[in-house]
Swiss-Prot record:
Subcellular localization, as worded in the UniProt entry: Cytoplasm
Function: Single strand-specific metallo-endoribonuclease involved in late-stage 70S ribosome quality control and in maturation of the 3' terminus of the 16S rRNA.
Superkingdom per UniProt: Bacteria
Enzyme Commission designation: 3.1.-.-
GO cellular component: cytoplasm
Predominant location category: cytoplasm
Keyword Aminoacyl-tRNA synthetase: no
Protein name from the UniProt record: Endoribonuclease YbeY
Keywords for the protein's UniProt record, in alphabetical order: Cytoplasm, Endonuclease, Hydrolase, Metal-binding, Nuclease, Ribosome biogenesis, rRNA processing, Zinc
Gene Ontology molecular function, alphabetical: metalloendopeptidase activity; RNA endonuclease activity; zinc ion binding
Family: Belongs to the endoribonuclease YbeY family.
One biological process term in Gene Ontology: rRNA processing
Family annotation (PROSITE patterns): UPF0054
Source lineage: Bacteria, Pseudomonadati, Pseudomonadota, Gammaproteobacteria, Enterobacterales
Length: 157
């Protein structure tokens, strides 16, 4: 039995073709139990306008993005299973999958894995951090049965 609670919010105009809630839960279950006994996560699926607005407000980037992660920080001394929120932009994920010639489901999985690691405190600002995070992502994606999302980059190095 999973100790992960998922609040999946569908804020897209078109809900056709989105992964099922069970897919999102399976992807979270591949990441979170490695680090926490229990976790509560919100995943909000949005259109480009909302992603753009949030990316501009919180990151100063004037464009929509694939995934934004907002870790929950409990006040000192308070233990809560709340991990945080992820906001994933449907159009960006679908466009990137097409541009990278990968399956949409694989790219959705990668965005959930990537966003989950951000919620857990991982980042990719420095090369060292990026290498650690990308290695974890590749390992988790393989466990899920998907290809290494960074394979093309590694081949070109």
């Amino acid at each position: 039995m999973s100790n992960i609670i998922l609040d999946l919010q569908l804020a897209c105009a078109d809900l056709q073709g989105l992964p099922a809630e069970g897919d999102f839960l399976r992807w979270l279950e591949a990441v979170l139990p490695r680090f926490r006994d229990e976790a509560e996560v919100t995943i909000r699926l949005v259109d480009e306008a909302e992603s753009h607005e949030l990316n501009l407000t919180y990151r100063g980037k004037d464009r929509p993005t694939n995934v934004l992660s907002f870790p929950f920080e409990a006040p000192p001394g308070i233990e809560l299973p709340l991990l945080g929120d992820m906001v994933i932009c449907r159009q960006v994920v679908e466009r990137e999958a097409q541009e990278q010639n990968i399956s949409q489901l694989s790219h959705w999985a990668h965005m959930v894995v990537h966003g989950s690691l951000h919620l857990l405190g991982y980042d990719h600002i420095s090369d060292e951090e990026a290498e650690e995070m990308e290695s974890l992502e590749a390992e988790i994606m393989q466990v899920l049965g998907y290809p290494d999302p960074y394979a093309a980059e590694k081949e070109s190095d």
